[in-house]
Amino acid sequence: MSSKSASKLKREAKKAERLAAKGESVKPSKKNGTKNGKDKEVDGVTKDLSELSTSDPIFERSASGVLTSQPMSRDIKIDSYTLSFHGRLLIENATIELNHGQRYGLLGDNGSGKSTFLESVAARDVEYPEHIDSYLLNAEAEPSDVNAVDYIIQSAKDKVQKLEAEIEELSTADDVDDVLLESKYEELDDMDPSTFEAKAAMILHGLGFTQEMMAKPTKDMSGGWRMRVALSRALFIKPSLLLLDEPTNHLDLEAVVWLENYLAKYDKILVVTSHSQDFLNNVCTNIIDLTSKKQLVYYGGNFDIYMRTKEENETNQMKAYLKQQEEIAHIKKFIASAGTYANLVRQAKSKQKIIDKMEAAGLVEKPEPPRQFSFEFDEVRKLPPPIIAFNDVAFSYDGNLDHALYRDLSFGIDMDSRVAIVGKNGTGKSTLLNLITGLLIPIEGNVSRYSGLKMAKYSQHSADQLPYDKSPLEYIMDTYKPKFPERELQQWRSVLGKFGLSGLHQTSEIRTLSDGLKSRVVFAALALEQPHILLLDEPTNHLDITSIDALAKAINVWTGGVVLVSHDFRLIGQVSKELWEVKDKKVVKLDCSIEEYKKSMAKEVQSRDTTAKVKHLI
């Protein structure tokens, strides 16, 4: 008999004893959806879950609003919500409406306040019922001696102990609250501690962990793998409100496919930011658009449906706007021509009242045109191919050929190359980029590079190396003015403007910019390097969708070569002409599209999970 059925029988037996003592009969118990929506008291453990994932804000953030959802509802509705950060207004008089069972994709430009909004909701800046426990994923697991599985399940073990203590206390009380006791039993049943380790292993396995990696202390893991541990805990806890800020960052393509499939079944409230249209299409049931007017606008459906609906709405709004403006112009023309004739003056006053009523009711606003900006890399002089050639290259970090990460690599790269490198995490994609740049040296074979070749590399950690106490304008002028001494201030501003940085974003300290805006500063600096080859290691991690499209267009018209490592299927499809897979110490050129590659990967993920079940991993 399972622990779940045993606890239920125990619950029913105790309930029967109490009711029999009162001379009453036992009524069939009913289970109505998620238990959290029925709690009558503040659940201290669910509060603890929020505290696991949030901390006091480092920077100044203020928010206000009015909770209007019902106290015991599993939904959240907050009216008149306003959010500021560093004194800058991000959201004004908007409505937060998050319904149980829905999965929301949160969209907005870089710097619009998406991450700050998630932090505000997780921190309960505007209070909502404590029975709705929340978890915000925005940081990696801390380094410690605890292994991945124990790190994940410890908080759940603590919650079970507290629930058992509460049940014991409620069961022995003089005046037993049967409804509350029932909800506590149901909550304990749903957790089922006997499955904790298996469930944790299943999630870790899905995100690419082997059995050996699961047993490693988190202090022995890289930041990327610790981020996966943190993501695994968020999925394991399964809070009533799960807030994920760019969860696909640090994942390889295979893990992204697994996460898409997992989150598509999430049956509580999910709010996720993502730069991947594929991900938003496969996961989300709704879209929230944080607009330039500082409003939260809600759309039903996934990203593609959102785009179609938004375009239709804007088309209809433009028609209504033009029609109304034409009507107003016609009325004003009549009023202007009325002169002093008494009967015409009366008509003119009547017509003016029509305009006054329109204005009082609110005129149709002209739709804002889509924000347009483009990344731009300067043209460079063509070099004869191959400008980079690998000849029988082998590489090992310890110099031992028996431990080689690569063997027998032979290929060429030229200025027409548009290569996307794919493969699992840990197979050496970033290492390959470092071999191309010369940062790493082969232990066998050689890499030849054309004399005068200039390369520029973007890595997912490039933004962390920016001088945070300087503004973007100060940074690029201090760094590149010796290279371009003739440039005036406006020309430097223009460089930043080419990458969507304008106004205060150019002159504010870099530390105050969003991660996406910091990434744009890095791209502006890369453009000033005027390279022949761009090496891009996860360039989309902090860019919004508009920025990614701008990057893709810039790459496609640029005259230099590009080698790309990315987990963004759409960007790969937009820019790559070749797919190279890193596998079994080799680099293999694939004869398929990225869409076909994703389909084959999805089949592999499904097969792998089936195998894991057979091996009792789950």
From Swiss-Prot:
Originating species: Schizosaccharomyces pombe (strain 972 / ATCC 24843) (Fission yeast)
Regions of compositional bias (Basic and acidic residues) in chain numbering: 14-27, 36-45
Gene3D superfamilies noted in UniProt: P-loop containing nucleotide triphosphate hydrolases
Keyword annotations of the record: ATP-binding, Cytoplasm, Nucleotide-binding, Phosphoprotein, Repeat
UniProt superkingdom: Eukaryota
Residues bearing PTM Phosphoserine: S50, S53, S55, S64
Domain ABC transporter: 76-325, 388-609
Gene Ontology terms, MF aspect: ATP binding; ATP hydrolysis activity
Protein name (Swiss-Prot/TrEMBL): Uncharacterized ABC transporter ATP-binding protein C16H5.08c
Phosphothreonine modifications at: T54
Residues given in the record as ATP binding sites: 108-115, 423-430
Keyword set includes ATP-binding: yes
GO CC aspect terms: cytosol
